[in-house]
Amino acid sequence: MPSFAQAEDADLVRCLNAPTGSEQKQCTQALFQNAVEEMKKVHVRVMEKAAEADARNSGSGDGSAAAAIAASQRAWEIYRDAECRDVVGRGGGSGRMVWVFGCLAEKTRDRIRELNIPFDQR
């Protein structure tokens, strides 16, 4: 059975093999949008767990896990967007957005895996 990463790679390959540039762009954009929706769900779960941890650890002086994760997420989104739009997408061309959306989808999927790592293993 293929792994999660292999299935993702297969999705991207399917998009890149679409017959027209327009179809490739639509396909990679959909991959990105689906990854963002999944990341939002995972982020909500992580924030709920962080809030529970904050409640258990109140008064410990450790600071808020929820606030740290929220700040980390904002910084990560800035990094992802800059990396994909300004680095991968540099140079233009008709296929630029196919590569940008592919990059955005890939980095978002990577972030989902990171967010799914339990707190005590980070």
Language-model-derived ranges and their functions:
Residues 4-122:
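N-terminal alpha-helical modules
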